[in-house]
Amino acid sequence: MKRNFELIPTNGIKINTLIEGDGKPVIFVHGWPESWYSWRHQINPFKKAGYKVIIPDIRGYGRSEKPKNVNSYSLKEITNDLIGILDHLKEEEAHIIGHDWGAPISWYTSLLFPKRILSVSGLSVPFNPFNEIPPIKLLEQIYKNTFFYILYFQKIGFAEKELEKDIEKSLRLIYCNSDAFGMKKMIDLALKNNLNEKDKKSLFLEGMNEPKDLPSWLSNRDLKYF
């Protein structure tokens, strides 16, 4: 099915955005490592329910522009991107739904722009308010010498070198080890004390199981698209 996309200028960059349907807008915000395509199964049901579906590739993802400066990827910048999309479409307000890393984006869009957001829904990640300790410092205190992926991602160039070596394999490992079945396997191993703890010098994909087959929710065609 041919989808309707628009490259929308917003907040100084251009964001690839799927726009379909009529009615009150619903913005869907994807997580990592994903794109608008993660919400493909929600498009038609929401259109039939009478909503305008808006699904951007968040800056840095998919066909949206990718600023080189790391500071360009703050929650403040990304929330401004979304509000700019509403402005471009001449929409005063919208519902917003986020999954994974898209959930904090959704929470903070509603927090920073309460008059523009009708409702907010977060999947996978609960609301986490800022506190006196910066998030990275807090994670460093919690994990110390233990591997944690967000801390690993702070090392500029490390994750890129590992994950871009074979992008399709990286995505296959990530998707198949972080879905409900993959997480259950890790929890079961942890409960039996058979889960090897990674130290902070480990690589992201280290210890992930190579799947023999893709899960029912992910086809080879889907994987190729991502």
Task: Say what each PLM segment does.
Residues M1-V26, K48-Y51, E91-E92:
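Alpha/beta-hydrolase fold catalytic core
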